[in-house]
């Protein structure tokens, strides 16, 4: 009985993954508002009824995709800096953690679309307030290590939050320019510019002392 249940669960997981892959393709092409369960089912090779047996609506599918993306983001950030010994400076940890989340989105532009709702003009349309808050919390979890490092460098909580917000905003702006190709008109590299911003931030904070 247990082996049978395991096979059934494996089959269900496989179907769910296939549906999510199909939905990702549809959302990239049509956006969350333009997509439909019928279109997702067609892309996946299932009936709409089969999709509904796994997901309540298209927003739930979108939320599942974004949640999975954010879990991968957090895993990358958590792993960053593992080679840094316990006596390393907070500045080194800040560099590692900031480079981790920026690098994740630089290497995965489709996750950038999901994470920042670029398919709908960067507005979280279609998601319930509860789901949107839950997803925002997971995004914030990936950014908290930078905030903690800033506090370890001597900033109070409010100042650390402000600097971390500026760091994130700067990074997202560069990612957007890279993602759209606009950065090429300046002949610049997004990663190099972000790294320079982090170094300048660290030097500025050191100068406060």
Where are the language model's segments positioned?
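Short coil/turn segments at alpha/beta junctions that flank glycine-rich nucleotide-binding fingerprints
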Residues: 29-33, 108, 153
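Amphipathic alpha-helical segments used for helix-helix packing
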Residues: 106-127, 176-184
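Amphipathic C-terminal alpha-helical segment
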Residues: 103-107, 148, 165-186, 201-209
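Hydrophobic alpha-helical connector segments
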Residues: 64, 78-110, 157, 163-167
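Helix-turn-helix
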Residues: 18, 26-60, 64
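Generic hydrophobic, amphipathic alpha-helix propensity
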Residues: 15-23, 40, 65-77
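N-terminal intrinsically disordered/low-complexity leader segments
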Residues: 1-14, 209
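Amphipathic alpha-helical packing segments from all-alpha helical-bundle domains
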Residues: 77-78, 92, 114, 125-154, ...
